[in-house]
Amino acid sequence: MSSPQLYYRLSARTHATPLRDSVARDVVHLLNCAMRGASMGMPSDAPVASSVLNFGNPCMATLGRSRVDPQHIANSIRQTLAAFEPRLLATRTLVVARQDTDSPGSRALYFDVHGVLRHQGHHIAIRLVLDYLGGFFEWIQERP
């Protein structure tokens, strides 16, 4: 049996960091996948709408829209996480468009995702950047 001192030397951060990194990578992958159903015109309450066959983020290109709405995209991100990321509690997930998003000439939008991991109860914070001309998300990793 191991010594109890070893238990106290292990920090919660060492366990939470790899899990947070894994969730962050998977969130970026999820958001960079496009829902197939968005282009097929299926009803949103159809069972396939939230199945793995329709995995991903809804299409952000909408006909007739010339302005990018960060709040609309933040809501879309939250709904995608609620549907397809089971490690985050959907009721405790918040996606916020950062204020520096609307700088003139910028082609990037910044989002902060705050959530709670379902089984461990740890808070998780992920910073994302969306290059909306290229149409892809990236994870902004914090420097140690």
Language model regions located:
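Charged, alpha-helix-enriched surfaces in structured cytosolic catalytic cores
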Residues: 18, 22, 68, 72, ...
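Acidic, low-complexity glycine/serine/threonine-rich segments
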Residues: 54-100
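Immediate N-terminus of the mature polypeptide
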Residues: 1-65, 117-144
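Beta-rich nucleic-acid/ligand-interaction surfaces
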Residues: 96-111
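A short beta-strand signature
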Residues: 111-117
